[in-house]
Amino acid sequence: MKDKVYKRPVSILVVIYAQDTKRVLMLQRRDDPDFWQSVTGSVEEGETAPQAAMREVKEEVTIDVVAEQLTLIDCQRTVEFEIFSHLRHRYAPGVTRNTESWFCLALPHERQIVFTEHLAYKWLDAPAAAALTKSWSNRQAIEQFVINAA
């Protein structure tokens, strides 16, 4: 029997927005259709946070940051939060907190998104996107790096 592989409690958040409209891309989770969020994911063993951010963007919304010569912005912000109780089974026993690094990805324009891990996507004005997410860290990242940066 294989040992269970647990998620690392180290993750990234990538707020994707369109430079021309300042609207934010929000993704509807499969495991909780009432939960909308930006791109998120775990940092894998041996991977840096920026590498994880680029990988997750490519996996979740099929945008290749390198091939498209886009600039992934490291917000230089890391937060720690309590892992939702219904998600703790994914982590090693006793792990209750996660450390998340924030990034932004500015696309020139809104585009059709090919999503692979979510039910749907929406482009929303930044205040509406911030209000939609259940994640305080996602809300704060949108407010700080899209709304207040405008």
UniProtKB/Swiss-Prot annotation:
CDD domains: NUDIX_DHNTPase_like. GO terms for molecular function: dATP diphosphatase activity; dihydroneopterin triphosphate pyrophosphohydrolase activity; magnesium ion binding; metal ion binding. InterPro entries: DHNTPase (IPR003564), NUDIX_hydrolase-like_dom_sf (IPR015797), NUDIX_hydrolase_CS (IPR020084), NUDIX_hydrolase_dom (IPR000086), Nudix_hydrolase_domain (IPR051325). Substrate binds at K7, R29, T40, F81, E82, I83, F84, S135. Keywords: Folate biosynthesis, Hydrolase, Magnesium, Metal-binding. It is an enzyme of class 3 (hydrolase). Its cofactor is Mg(2+). Residues 5-146 form the Nudix hydrolase domain. Belongs to the Nudix hydrolase family. The lineage of its organism: Bacteria, Pseudomonadati, Pseudomonadota, Gammaproteobacteria, Enterobacterales. PANTHER family: BIS(5'-NUCLEOSYL)-TETRAPHOSPHATASE [ASYMMETRICAL] (PTHR21340:SF0), DIADENOSINE 5,5-P1,P4-TETRAPHOSPHATE PYROPHOSPHOHYDROLASE MUTT (PTHR21340). This is Dihydroneopterin triphosphate diphosphatase. Mg(2+) binds at E56, E60, E117. It catalyses: 7,8-dihydroneopterin 3'-triphosphate + H2O = 7,8-dihydroneopterin 3'-phosphate + diphosphate + H(+). Catalyzes the hydrolysis of dihydroneopterin triphosphate to dihydroneopterin monophosphate and pyrophosphate. Required for efficient folate biosynthesis. Can also hydrolyze nucleoside triphosphates with a preference for dATP.
